[in-house]
């Protein structure tokens, strides 16, 4: 599990990801299962049994490292993950999303699909209506020099004076917009 957390952390900080070889199945063939995140008050479907972990990450906002909770797993040729952390000042949530996106998307280019345009708003019911609540599909070079695709969404939920900052992502060898829509469409704030 330690290796998984290191890989996921690298992906968040530098847009790096695990790239596995193989051909992906249709989304119907993946064994989707619903996972409840009680602390986050969120449901999401994963195509594999996710591992969980926590690590401190400094997003460069001037607040120092924050404790990020992570959940993720590998299915066929892709890594699926969900991460979240609590920002004490909800008024800075849009800024936090911008910093996280900058850390994850640096040096990557957009790869739009028929029904998924990079930078399009992504605001699930119950999420804060923020300009940086978006969906993006980008392509870039992975840690071993291979081309990789990152499908990601960023959004926030207000919790009193705080905000929970949430990021869901798929790292894969090629774009798979249908599977990404299946994964992101399953995100439900309770």
Task: Mark where each language-model region is.
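A short acidic-to-branched-hydrophobic micro-motif
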Residues: 68-99, 165-171
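Glycine-centered tight beta-turn/hairpin loop motif at sheet-sheet or coil-to-beta transitions
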Residues: 37-41, 75-79, 143-145
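C-terminal motif of bacterial Sec signal peptides marking the signal peptidase cleavage site
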Residues: 20-22
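Bacterial signal peptide processing site
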Residues: 24-26
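Post-signal peptide N-terminal segment of mature Sec-exported envelope proteins
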Residues: 30-53
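Signature of long, low-cysteine stretches enriched in small and polar/charged residues
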Residues: 45, 49-70, 104-159
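Surface-exposed amphipathic alpha-helical segments
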Residues: 38, 50-52, 96-114, 160-190
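Bacterial N-terminal signal peptides that target proteins for export
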Residues: 2-12
């Amino acid at each position: 599990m330690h290796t998984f957390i290191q890989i996921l952390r690298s992906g968040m900080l530098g847009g790096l990801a695990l790239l596995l070889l193989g051909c992906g199945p249709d989304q119907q063939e993946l064994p989707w299962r619903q996972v409840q995140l009680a602390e986050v008050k969120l449901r999401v479907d994963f195509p594999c049994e996710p591992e969980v972990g926590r690590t401190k990450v400094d997003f460069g906002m001037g607040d120092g490292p924050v404790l990020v909770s992570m959940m993720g797993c590998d299915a066929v040729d892709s890594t699926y993950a969900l991460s979240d952390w609590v920002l004490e000042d909800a008024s800075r949530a849009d800024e936090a999303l911008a910093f996280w996106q900058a850390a994850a998307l640096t040096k990557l280019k957009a790869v739009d699909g028929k029904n998924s345009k990079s930078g399009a708003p992504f605001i699930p019911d119950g999420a804060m209506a923020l300009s940086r609540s978006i969906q993006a599909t980008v392509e870039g070079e992975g840690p071993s020099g291979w081309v990789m695709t990152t499908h990601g969404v960023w959004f926030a939920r207000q919790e009193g004076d705080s905000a929970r900052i949430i990021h869901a992502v798929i790292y894969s060898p090629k774009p798979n917009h249908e599977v990404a829509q299946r994964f992101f469409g399953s995100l439900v704030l309770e």
